[in-house]
């Protein structure tokens, strides 16, 4: 049994999704492996059905991101005793999904969590037909971290498919102050950008930062 810290005020999300069951124990949301017993779909409440749908799509999103640095970020995130990176990802991203089984608010998706701080003044601008520039303040009192912290950028489509391009080898550090993000030939124009920084040894992370891209 794994505990999941809920961030949904007034919503009790329970039900079976794939190999997992989301349930409440002493008021604490938990996840455990599902048993082989069958349960009639008619026996679920509407709240449980919504919880099932959200968890199903959260699992799909996590699986899509597993091959990337996002998995390591959540493994390193501060968690409750016994909580896995997957549990932490679910609890922090549950509220981003709506009743219609899609991401309702992309700004509430968290691609990383950690104890490092984001630099101040982060901004994104469209600088070409297929190019973005990400910038941030590098003055000493604004940098809020080591100049050697590595930048990671994620670009996500807005069609609910979870198609995400992860720029893991940006070669850009916190001390550089800006990064040019060029789309590869054949890549569609993403609607959503997430970025975060990791320490040079890859053991500590910042929370992720989000922006919607306004292509011209």
Regions inferred by a protein language model and the residue ranges of each:
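Charged linear interaction tracts used for macromolecular binding and regulation
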Residues: 77-216
């Amino acid at each position: 049994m794994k505990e999941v810290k809920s961030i949904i005020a007034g919503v009790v999300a329970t039900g079976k999704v794939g190999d997992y069951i989301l349930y409440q124990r002493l008021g604490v949301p938990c996840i455990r492996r599902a048993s082989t017993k069958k349960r009639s779909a008619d026996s679920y409440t509407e709240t449980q059905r919504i919880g099932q749908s959200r968890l199903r799509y959260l699992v799909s999103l996590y699986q899509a991101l597993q091959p990337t640095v996002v998995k390591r970020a959540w493994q390193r995130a501060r968690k409750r005793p016994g909580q896995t990176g997957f549990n932490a990802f679910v609890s922090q991203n549950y509220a981003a999904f709506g009743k219609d089984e899609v991401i309702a608010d992309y700004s509430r998706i968290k691609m990383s969590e950690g104890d490092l701080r984001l630099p101040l003044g982060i901004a994104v601008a469209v600088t070409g037909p297929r190019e973005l520039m990400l910038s941030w303040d590098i003055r000493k009192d604004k940098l809020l971290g080591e100049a050697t912290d590595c930048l990671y950028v994620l670009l996500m489509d807005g069609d609910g498919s979870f198609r995400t391009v992860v720029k893991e080898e940006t070669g850009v550090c916190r001390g550089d102050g800006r990064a040019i993000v060029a789309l590869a030939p054949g890549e569609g124009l993403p609607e959503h950008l997430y970025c975060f920084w990791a320490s040079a040894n890859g053991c500590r992370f910042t929370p992720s930062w989000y922006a919607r891209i306004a292509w011209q």
